[in-house]
Amino acid sequence: MQNKGLVICVAVLLTLASIFYLSFSVATSYYDGQAAKIKDPIARQDYKDSVKYLGIYPYQKCLETQIGLGLDLKGGMNVILEISVPDVVDVLADHKTDAAYQKAMKEAKAQEATSQSDFITLFVDNFHKIAPGRKLAEIFATQQLKGKVSTQSSDKEVEKALREEVAASIDNSYNVVRNRIDQFGVVQPNIQKLEGQEGRLMVEMPGIREPERMRKLLQGSANLEFWETYNNQEIAPYLTQLDQRLANGETKAETKDSVTNATNKKQVTEKKTTTKLSLKDDNIGENVGSNAQMAAARKEHPLLSILQLTPGDALSVVGYASVRDTAAVNKIIYSKLAQQVLPSDLRLRWSAKPADGLKQKNIFELHALKVTTSDGRAPLEGDVITDAKDQFDQYGRPEVSMTMNSDGARQWAAITKANLGKAVAIVLDGLVYTAPRINSEITGGSSSISGSFTIEDTKDLANTLKSGRMPAPARIVQEEVVGPTLGAQSIQQGLWSFAIAFVLLMIYMVIMYDVIPGMLANCALLANLFFTLGILASFQSALTMPGIAGIVLTLGTAVDANVLIYERIKEEMRAGKGIKDALQAGYSNAFSAIFDSNFTSLITGIILLVTGTGPIRGFATTWIIGIICSFFTAVYLTRIVFENRLGKDKWLNQKFYTSISKNLMRNMHIKFMSFYKTTFTISAIVAVVFLVSIFFVRGLSKSIDFTGGRNYVITLNKKVHVEDVRKVLNNAFVNTTGENAGKPATTTVIALGTEGNTIRVSTNYNIESNDPAEDDHAETVLYNALKKGGFVSQANVEKFKDPDIREGGSIISSSKVGPSVAKDITHGAIRSVALALIFIFIYILVRFRNLGFSVGSVVALALDTLIVIGFYSVCYGWIGFSLEIDQTFIGAILTVIGYSINDKVVVFDRIRENMKLHPKQDYQTLFNDSINQTLTRTINTSFSTLIVLLSIFILGGDSIRSFAFAMILGVFFGTLSSIFIASPVAYLVLGKKTENRLKNKSEKE
């Protein structure tokens, strides 16, 4: 074998990298176990803050690097937020009453629902049609776009400016969402802009227990404010006094001590505090001393033991605290006693990021803001900002330039004039992003903010300033909430399905190919699994239930490569070759089939990754990684082991069969090409039946992914008949908004699981409404109806919505898909399946250089797809589990295409090989022989894959059962279509071409 050293080097590097990244998961699990033994929550957090894996990586880094669990396994919330592009354009426009503008906006909004073009393109095209002689600059030469659009700007320049503003709005929304989630304390959130879906952000938040709060937080407008501030030395006496009164046991004060009295005590207290908690002290934020010492310090100084006052002139920064102590500080500074002691015009706010120089210790600043208005609001808000950008000053130092409109410029001049030498705090959503010193009065509305900034700091600050002029808040257009109990159940089901599938595969390989080859293939499976998990860990990917299914399915497809190799080795040994020559020929001859089949699977995997979202991407990621790893382990690693062991005498007599498999399907001479008329007729009848069912009779059971609506998975307080629940819910949901106002919403109920007390309710109730309150209202309607029917016994709707409270009935998971998202999912599903077929057609054509193979592949794949969809059409409602068409089903269809093409490529590869070996043999005999020669491999691979899929289907739980069922259908019918459809079609096309070529040749002669 060539390049053996390179293969070994790659294997060693992969092994070391996998061990390194997977070790973070082990370390995190160990630290969590040790921390769980500590009863005191503060001491527990101190322990986590103090530990360092390998003496380098803190606990938080371990947490971020470990393989995380997705929402379906851990529980949590997944939302897609949409920033309305029409709203952004509308804010930027002047002359909004202009008839042409209004009509163009109306037409563009209507067309957006069905067009694949983006809104700006539609708007510009409509404006040109409605007002052909006018320029867009007439509408958009506004103060908002000053410097970008003037009355002389061309339409292309205006369109470019609009696109830049839309992109900026999306970036601003991304930053606001990220900051709000950080503020909420979500561990390992995933926030990303959805490629190809303008204005949409996907947010995954594991472990969320309060979805109502998060909905309000994510959909609120950004609140950017400019505040005047106190100097830290002005506020320190009050904080010292508050600390002393707390130490004396006071919880409420009737009168406020004078500032003079507080000041008199200042020097002594400050001296004690700075001695214990100096900024230069290496122990800030770390676990120092015993629990008893910490308790004594907190008793003596309830506030100043956790909040360090800043010495000297620190402008608005009055103190520092570790992130773990901020909640305790908040409890004190917002207490009734604090209201009595602290100035009434004081507002204390935390910094958005850790203090400079203390980021590793998570030390945050506490700023003192000053109320100067009668209504208690900030004197200046973010809506006055017209632009903000990061740049460099004349000395090459990073700074931020900020421009305001005329009203803002006037107010800004007054604020800066009144606060010379003081700080003005820039606050977004209640957190201070910076508090620069005012050096001079600023007039004209243009300012520069400089300091000890890095380039990243100025970029973040510029984005923060631009966040204040968000034209419209983001709204949730798709949502999924999974309770932690359901997540734990999914983990158990996923692990069981994986373990059973793996054991069955190991046994099957030993039965078919003897102990040593079988166990070597099993070791390759283990290596494949190890490398896959290691690569996932290096990507910091979250493991989902579809992801586990992807790994399990990878085991089935990994067996395919070993089966191909072993079957070729058996053929070579039957031909009289020794073990060494048979091994070399077997690996060499199987390579092209393995490469082509894996590459075509990669095509569908990449399409899934690009077009899918959420769980489908999780499946695609693990599948792609698994395909690559299985190719490496099966083709290269096992060969190295075999070649290294051939020097052993017992290996020279190694067989690749057992008594069971020795003569299995050997010397088969089935004339498959003679059946093509019969198989074509049967296939045509089946296709017609399924097409009639899909389009004219039963249709498809479409999920909310394609129709829009809400899903609720609910545990009830008793076993029920689904029909009884349907009767209760039939008229419960009546639309109150949109075109269907006053009409009952479409509501369906299906049973889940085997216990009889779990159902799923789907409804399109008020789904067209943009009001965030509709989500809570829908849950209230559901609760009232089920409560009235006696199916839940919770005291109130809040307990009904708590997934942790199972007794009495509760919502354990929920999801929502808006109509615009449903439309995009539908288009995306059609596009992804079409792309898969097109790319596979092109690849087969390029690789095999023959149109017949491409046509045969695509015809068979199209039939496979139709049969699976047709089964779902005919069987839904008659089987005891859901057969809905959803995103997961589309993922299954693409996986079926990827798997099915594997089998077809292997058959075609043997046909291609035989065409070279026997160029004069007639095509009918050649095709029949090729199919018979690969029949053992076809049956073995299909059977091993079905073992895996049956394991997922039986043990994987409701969330993945429909996916497994579609795959089982796809594998079964895909195997049949390889033999009875793809090969005969290729035979007919090739035969016709050969017949024409011979005819032309004879005519020339």
Give the predicted meaning of each segment.
Residues 22-28, 49, 65-75, 81-429, ...:
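Non-transmembrane, solvent-exposed regions of membrane trafficking/translocation machinery
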Residues 2-4, 400-401, 405-420, 424-425, ...:
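Interfacial segments of transmembrane alpha-helices in multi-pass membrane proteins
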Residues 177, 485-505, 557, 577-613, ...:
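Pore- and gate-forming transmembrane helices of large, multi-pass membrane proteins
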Residues 204, 444-448, 456-504, 781, ...:
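Juxtamembrane "pre-transmembrane" interface segments
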Residues 12-15, 518-540, 551-558, 619-634, ...:
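Small-residue-enriched core segments of transmembrane alpha-helices in multipass membrane transport
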Residues 556-600, 643-651, 873, 879-941, ...:
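Cytosolic juxtamembrane regions of multi-pass inner-membrane proteins
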Residues 1-21, 26-63, 67, 87-101, ...:
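Interfacial helix-loop-helix hairpins and adjacent transmembrane helices
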Residues 8, 527, 534-535, 571-592, ...:
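Hydrophobic alpha-helical transmembrane segments of membrane transport and translocation systems
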